[in-house]
Amino acid sequence: IAAKQLTGKPLVVHMHATSYDRASDDQVDTRVVDLETKGMMAADKVMAVSELTRNICINRYGIDPDKVVAVHNAVDFSGREKLEVERNVKEKVVTFLGRVTYQKGPEYFIEAAAKVLKRCNNVRFVMAGSGDMLNRCIRHVARLGISDRFHFTGFLRGKEVHKMFALSDVYVMPSISEPFGISPLEAMQTNVPSIISKQSGCAEILSYALKVDF
């Protein structure tokens, strides 16, 4: 805002996520909401990563619809080398990869895993990532008695992420609210099918992904 005032140049705000994505309504930090509102109100244009985020900007923050546009995220499919990985497990691998936080819905993934394992034992579940709910999720898995089929990798980066996708048979993104969600596109790079939340921006463009209410 100060740069706009100083230079007289137009201000464009790129909204990757909002406070309403990161927390439930009763947990939203109103101080952050005020800052987000101030920034978007001062902007000449607001770029949202999805129609979902665009609607939040308009309906929750009162931003003029005429200045909010949706521009979806993307990944570069060119130049990605195919990873050859050795699988040391014979079971199918179902993966959650992301921050282990309220927004990402990790406990829905755990509950789904428990239900699947009651019907089918030929599958392993992997939760790749770290976050403030990690220890809670580890205890949850132990309480459900599925620790022998459920694995926690911790935080992954770079080639570790691509290797994890290459080892996976299915990727699951059970987010409660996901402004876009780039990981299903990354899974597509290794030909891994995805089950994604309907409450996500990428659901607007991934017509062949299985979409679920979490």
Where are these regions (language model features)?
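Short hydrophobic beta-strand element within catalytic cores of glycosyltransferases
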Residues: 193-196
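Short alpha-helical donor nucleotide-sugar binding micro-motif in glycosyltransferases
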Residues: 155-156, 163-168
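Nucleotide-activated donor-binding/catalytic signature segment of Leloir-type glycosyltransferases, i.e.
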Residues: 138-156
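Conserved donor-binding/catalytic core segment of Leloir-type glycosyltransferases
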Residues: 47, 88-113, 126
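Aromatic "clamp/platform" in nucleotide-sugar-dependent glycosyltransferases that forms part
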Residues: 176
